[in-house]
Amino acid sequence: MIELQQLCRSFQIGDQCVHALDHIDLHIERGEYLSVMGPSGSGKSTLLNMLGLLDTPSGGEYRLNQTATSQLNEEARATLRREHIGFVFQSYHLIPRLTARENIELPLILAGIAPKQRKPIIDRVITRLALTDRAAHVPSQLSGGQRQRVAIGRAIVMKPELLLADEPTGNLDSVSGREVIELLEELNDEGITLLVVTHDQAIGVRAKRELKMIDGRIASDSARPAITPQLAP
Amino acid sequence: MRIADLLAFNLKLIERQRLRSAMLLAAIAISVMAINLLTGIGEGGKQFVLGEFNLLGKNVLIMLPGKKETTGGIPPLTGETTRDLTLRDAQAIARLANVSAVAPLIAGKMEISHHKLSREAFTIGSNRAFFAIRQLEVAQGKALPLLPFEQGQAVCVIGSKLRKELFGPKPALGQWLRAGDSRFRVIGILKDKGEGLGFDMNEAIIVPVANAQALFNQAGLFRVFIELRSLDGLQQSQQRILALLKERHEGEEDVTIITQDSLLSAFENILNTLTLAVAGIAGISMLVAGILIMNVSLIAVSQRTREIGLLKALGCPARTVALIFLSEASIMALSGALLGILISELLLATARGLYPTIPFTTPFWAQLGSALIATVTALLFAAIPARKAANMAPVDALLDKKAGQA
């Protein structure tokens, strides 16, 4: 489903060129559950933004469902995001003036879906996330865990194939953090491809496939054990 | 995005961010109001001045003694023998074919007293025709009687303010006033009316012209108002009057005739300056309004860069993002402009109530212009930052990179 070939992303900071992503090759199958770990500045968020088409590569190619994305314009990338990708951010990024229900509804509205068709979809998502009695509340009236559930609801309401979560538990206490990660894992069990960027070792190891990043490179990938020189038997 | 959803989204924004919306609405409304009020007051002043000139009918000529050279050139160095304009001259004019009425005028300040109260008042000597020509109405009693020019009568008509000052609450009709060494019986009181051509008729006393000649001990007339039967042949009538006076004054043309048109054209410079001043005031207030709206719009949009980032992450095309912000700005601008016009109309109506003589009205061009300028600036300065944010990489907008790097 996802194919990265020699993907690069560099930033000019002052007169220094920083390689946030340094020739990355990565292959992700549909339905996989990955965690990306690594120290700050190792490029894990840049990788997530790249996979989410929020950022454009400086070099290399990214294929999403066999579509080469590097040549696409912003409009086409927006359409791909809308139809295939859901985002969960550390700071939720909910619109403060909209209620929980309206925040979840937003992607459907932007996609131009008729109100009649929207209603059953949102109802299902709200029930699924156990937010029924909080649906009419604005984010400031919700707890952190509830806010992140609303954000997850918004991410999955368009039924994307890929769910990208950037430190989804970073602002949460351990109990709500675990609830959120369990919710994401349930969604993965239902078939969604899940990629979680995290600092938290305990969360990282729950993934079926763990990536470790250092200095813009994938230092280890549990699916492809490092080829260490082995002594001949 | 569907139109209904777009509207709902914007209305929610306006409804749930009341402070921000109120600020933007107030900025636009105040700007539009300022433009409308200022031009309304300026226009009111201009119309007031114009109205003053229109007090004289178009078919009324004013004759002054002496020749005013308006053609330039070297002024006559020899001393001019200015003959007086006499009542006989006025009588001769009254006999001309196209002349319907003639009002001779002598005017000056005179001490007027009643019992112990006394006051210096503007004293006018004229006749019955003067009332019609100057459009003076009598509130109580009657106007001066119809008399031959040379015949006096000890009666007077006084302005409402003079009446109040001399008689207070007591009735004035039939009472006697002293002016100089003559006495006059009050036979009429003028209706309250503002100033006209510099005379405050509310403070004036009008007596028959023959009496005024005696009072001021002066035979010469200050001026003569001539009312023509019709406007056709205005030029010819003017020529005939001048010819008549030349004949009567031993071949010398020593009077000047002023028409309303010539008076207006003489004041054209002043009126043009007034119009320019009004336009200048409008221009400056539009500029200030534009900058005010610009700032509030800029703040409103830059506060929402993260929201734009989110919309883009959710797959909203740049075009839709721009549409959301533009439609919101138009709703705000239009309702703000409407509110501003409404408030300014209300205030001007109040001002008209307080000062009925000055016609405070905002010209249509100012209303349209202010609404247009408000809408265009609000749209422009919502569009520029919204466009910029919409064209940012989604990741930069989400993190609001501008703020982050600062």
Question: Which residues does each PLM region occupy?
Answer:
Chain A
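ABC-family P-loop ATPase nucleotide-binding domain
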Residues: M1-S10, S220-P233
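H-loop (His-switch) and adjacent beta-strand-loop-beta switch element
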Residues: E210-A223
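ABC family nucleotide-binding domain
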Residues: M1-M213
